[in-house]
Amino acid sequence: MSGLGDSSSDPANPDSHKRKGSPCDTLASSTEKRRREQENKYLEELAELLSANISDIDSLSVKPDKCKILKKTVDQIQLMKRMEQEKSTTDDEVQKSDISSSSQGVIEKESLGPLLLEALDGFFFVVNCEGRIVFVSENVTSYLGYNQEELMNTSVYSILHVGDHAEFVKNLLPKSLVNGVPWPQEATRRNSHTFNCRMLIHPPDEPGTENQEACQRYEVMQCFTVSQPKSIQEDGEDFQSCLICIARRLPRPPAIMGVESFMTKQDTTGKIISIDTSSLRAAGRTGWEEFMRKCIYAFFQPQGREPSYARQLFQEVMTRGTASSPSYRFILNDGTMLSAHTKCKLCYPQSPDMQPFIMGIHIIDREHSGLSPQDDTNSGMSIPRVNPPVNPSISPAHGVARSSSLPPSNSNMVSTRVNRQQSSDLHSSSHSNSSNSQGSFGCSPGNQIVAGVALNQGQASSQSTNPPLNLNNSPMEGTGISLAQFMSPRRQVSSGLATRPRMPNNSFPPNIPTLNSPVSMTSTACNNSNRSYSNIPVTSLQSMNEGPNNSVGFSAGSPVLRQMSSQNSPSRLNIQPAKAESKDNKETASILNEMIQSDNSSNDGKPLDSGLLHNNDRLSDGDNKYSQTSHKLVQLLTTTAEQQLRHADIDTSCKEVLSCTGTSSSASANSSSGSCPSSHSSLTERHKILHRLLQEGSPSDITTLSVEPDKKDSASTSVSVTGQVPGNSGIKLELDASKKKESKDHQLLRYLLDKDEKDLRSTPNLSLDDVKVKVEKKEQMDPCNTNPTPMTKPPPEEIKLESQSQFTADLDQFDQLLPTLEKAAQLPGLCETERMDGAVTSVTIKSEILPATLQSTTARPTSRLNRLPELELEAIDNQFGQPGTGDQIPWANNTVTAVNQNKPEDQCISSQLDELLCPPTTVEGRNDEKALLEQLVSFLSGKDETELAELDRALGIDKLVQGGGLDVLSERFPPQQATPPLMMEERPNLYSQPYSSPSPTANLSGPFQGMVRQKPSLGTMPVQVTPPRGAFSPGMGMQPRQTLNRPPAAPNQLRLQLQQRLQGQQQLIHQNRQAILNQFAANAPVGINMRSGMQQQITPQPPLNAQMLAQRQRELYSQQHRRRQLIQQQRAMLMRQQSFGNNLPPSSGLPVPMGNPRLPQGAPQQFPYPPNYGTNPGTPPASTSPFSQLAENPEATLGNRNSMVNRGMTGNMGGQFGTGINPQMQQNVFQYPGSGMVPQGEANFAPSLSPGSSMVPMPIPPPQSSLLQQTPPASGYQSPDMKAWQQGAMGNNNVFSQAVQNQPTPAQPGVYNNMSITVSMAGGNTNVQNMNPMMGQMQMSSLQMPGMNTVCPEQINDPALRHTGLYCNQLSSTDLLKTEADGTQVQQVQVFADVQCTVNLVGGDPYLNQPGPLGTQKPTAGPQTPQAQQKSLLQQLLTE
């Protein structure tokens, strides 16, 4: 503490002022302030006295806390008192002499300095605030080589390295200058610091370049500095504040020997990709190539019975991400023994395109070569390391060492290192472990990891980990002591890395390698480049057996672990009879890795073979969804899968064989598994295990079950077991997952299992109840059951309604459970056929037959819902001889919505089943297929027209026909029979491709793309579709089952004729359209699209018969005539529009978005003749020409803007309008909704169009695209025929999907799209929805579709808009269109022409009604004039 006289209150003491430093002290008038300042000063002095590390305080930019200083002072005083007391008690009186060490120092001041300096091992110097050395001790010479005189009064910076000047200044100058924060009492503070700086060594005297270099040598000195802020007066000299420094040499770190190491890069299969030897070369040792090779060889060399460290590390790394091995030895050619250890890390490149890889660093331990591997501290991440703490107290000696849980490597290591005394026990345990790890090592680190993981978690992993391996035998397991417990706490031991004693003891014989097999099974997974590791199977097994313990956090480990677990199905883990299958395991592992990769890729959407289980994708995506599946089933499935993998020559691509159906490990949420092709064994064989499961309820059987497959023949049986029909496996999963053992479920399952494939082919239909039960189960099942059997045919209607109602609830669950369905759908190998819906007894159909990758997954739950109808559809398709051809439903994924998908899916499935199924690979499969087809054919052939029609309705085929789905199918399948359905299918094809416009169909893939197929509208279309139609949601147009070919049974002549006529009409229409479009090409970009589409459509047209030719000629004539009329009408329209002040929507606008839904008038003509043909009063017969209709009604609505619009549109459609109509109008007219290009030029006419007017031109600037929606006023038109069609919804439902309504651009949906879809024959179902968009988009509809029905005047609410009443009934659909708003109709006419063709085929009314303006969309079935009669042909056949 400062002396009494030192107080700042003493004015006579000059020191006091200096100490205060603050001018405030002298000026302070308040004693209080003075007291505070004095208090602060003392506190700071206290701090200096108390702490040698005041530098800690200095480094702060804030003053030290007073309380802390006082507290420390108190503590220090107390400590001193205690020390004094202790001293007094221990002092020996004898030593109280003058020279005693305990007496006061008698060393004189002069001799103390040198002694202190000598003791300091450094030199002492003082630097003033200007940086000059005021004093330096003589011993500086021994440190820096300078004499004392040389340095005195020189700048300290001359001997400091430039880089250390700042640090020195920081200590020299006041804190206020350094930190920028004023410290009021700074002048009174003494600061101590320690820092390192480089001091220049005195260069040699001899000059020379070398000396110049030498002069730059610096010595790193550690400086301890104390700042003396107070000036010191000594001998009359006034020493200002200065820095007192003591510099000493830094203790030199021990010379670091160059580390000899090299790095390897391995892929996820463990293969070395590259070796980096740069550090070895840098070490400069000779012969590094040799010991690099020897080291790698030793690293990959098996350790006795245990796998090599490379394998062990690989497993551990894949599981945990990092691993390190114990030391392993190798001998160089010269006899030198070296040891090395390896550390590995799993690296994930940033680029998703790059595969993860393992970086390993191999460090040569020359000094430690003598150490045993156990002693190697570098062992790294060995599992034991992690676990040892678990029970370090237990010494290995306890003999507990046996824990099987010890990773083999660990246990070995542990055993060797822990106590060889336990050798046998330890070994056995270690062995079991090793077998674990080895086995796993052989395959996947997973096993090892599993064991290790358990250890890591500190669980008695031995039990949890190994039990699946049947390690229970080891006493360790009984004890439940985890390996970690008996293992030495040393970390170095890595699980599975430790050298394993080769003495197998314990229950496991030396061959314990058998354990390897399970591991190997696991290992098979382990190779997966996917990062799925076989070891996971172990985990999964554990989890299965042990439940929570098993998880052991495996999944937590790494994505790899998770995948591994999924991959390693418990079955893999199942311990198989002790077989040394290390090679097999390795191969399996590699195969499995590839398989897993393929599985993963399949998830990515790569097609998997039908063999692959859809489960894989689902499981992987569903992650935990299947974790619930019963352990028993999972193990059962996995076991078989494992065996399949092991025994079957598995294609690396993981083709059919690899599908491990059941391998969903409950532990790992994502179990991606492949399904083994069922072809390997008969159904009954495959079902044996399932039967057993049903009979035996206890999970305890799993092990035996899993072991049995091993006993079975290698590939075929085991594969077959695993390969149980994917559907079946799915069923099993489902059953176990739901764990419902309802008698009914069992009955269904047993029924399916008891039936052989052949039997199943002929199995009676399941009742809907059964189906329902199954479906419910299915909630947790894979979507795909291999139940494509079309045999089950619940009454069509029942199926329709019930399937929808029954399955809709399930669909949501399916969607949730089967998120991977879509992906699976992409996988051809997924059991699409199964998706037929396990509900059907047809499950028996071979998976090979029904690989139907089809969109079963795509179909999703709906596919299941659809399954029943699908079966029928399938049968129908077969009849047409296209049974297997089923196109893959391009739209299946997108379009198929729950209910709607049901039917379309069915079609697709049926057609795709064959395609995807690929011809059955086995004779049995082919025979089955033939039998199925024959049955279908015979069944259908036995039906009369009425029954077939009912079937069609039940299946929604009629709707499909209307939607044009069948046409697409026919395209894909050469029409083998002249069945009308094929013909109809042909027709939609024509349109489908051409209209790739923005119409929803654009989303469709495959033949449906062109189709308006409102698929996109599926979810979006507001249209409410009646449940039956619902099957084809607004997207239905595309959805129509492709396979819905009508029963081939003797096709009605009527149907054939209708088809032919329709096709003929379509061809003519296409030709006419093309011609017109050519004219319009310049005007409307849409026109161009249409044209190309039309051309495409035309090409596919089937050969024409005489009837068709005649029809075509008639149509050509009528079209030409119409064109002339249209031109005239257009001119008239232009005149009228001008006269009306543009009141009429520009003809091109036709945008009158069929705003009044053009209620299809009477039935659309069923005959090739355009509905308007000869019906238009005063107009030439409506030719099929797309525009003809527009021209026909011009007068009718001349007064009405609508009629005007129609004419204008019609006239201008092809450049015809060009003369009178604004180019914009023309463009609008020609723009096809698909193009979505609606010139906004229409705005001119906009004034005439009131939002309410049905005529509102869709082309009107996009803002008016809503016009279509406005059009709904047409709802007034809705005739009862519209039925379920709601006008508002109808607008959306229009075949054109009313892109216009929804989309600012009326034309967005392809005009023709609607045509293909609009054709829905069934009473203007959802197809109408599709048509609406067309209407709005019809702007191009100037190409009138003869098939388009104009709204009947009656239907039109607005009298002005109404054409003469006769048009409704009299006019063909084309005329009807005209009758609507001329402009609108004109746009629609072209679309409708196509539609009408379709309509003619299907039955004009519904279609025409659909074509009606969106708003009105109700098909105006009401006026059934000749058209109604005409439409009756197809409708009679197709609809009631």
From Swiss-Prot:
Motif extent (LXXLL motif 7): 1434-1438
Residues covered by region (Interaction with CREBBP): 781-988
Positions where Phosphothreonine occurs in the chain: 1179
Stretches the record annotates as Interaction with STAT3: 361-567
GO cellular component: nucleus
PROSITE patterns tied to this protein: BHLH, PAS
Region (Disordered): 1-39, 83-103, 368-445, 496-515, 545-626, 661-739, 777-797, 1142-1187, 1408-1440
Cross-link (Glycyl lysine isopeptide (Lys-Gly) (interchain with G-Cter in SUMO2)): 846
GO biological process, one term: positive regulation of transcription by RNA polymerase II
Domain called PAS: residue spans: 109-180
Major localization listed first in the record, in broad terms: nucleus
Locus of motif LXXLL motif 2: 112-116
Domain of life: Eukaryota
Residues in bHLH domain copies: 23-80
Sequence similarity: Belongs to the SRC/p160 nuclear receptor coactivator family.
Functional note: Nuclear receptor coactivator that directly binds nuclear receptors and stimulates the transcriptional activities in a hormone-dependent fashion. Involved in the coactivation of different nuclear receptors, such as for steroids (PGR, GR and ER), retinoids (RXRs), thyroid hormone (TRs) and prostanoids (PPARs). Also involved in coactivation mediated by STAT3, STAT5A, STAT5B and STAT6 transcription factors. Displays histone acetyltransferase activity toward H3 and H4; the relevance of such activity remains however unclear.
Subunit structure: Interacts with PPARA; the interaction is direct. Interacts with PPARG; the interaction is direct. Interacts with ESRRG; the interaction is direct. Interacts with STAT5A (via FDL motif). Interacts with STAT5B (via FDL motif). Interacts with STAT6 (via LXXLL motif). Interacts (via LXXLL 1, 2 and 3 motifs) with RORC (via AF-2 motif). Interacts with ASXL1. Interacts with the methyltransferase CARM1. Interacts with COPS5. Interacts with the histone acetyltransferase CREBBP. Interacts with DDX5. Interacts with the histone acetyltransferase EP300. Interacts with ESR1. Interacts with GCCR.
Name of this protein: Nuclear receptor coactivator 1
UniProt source species: Sus scrofa (Pig)
Gene field: NCOA1
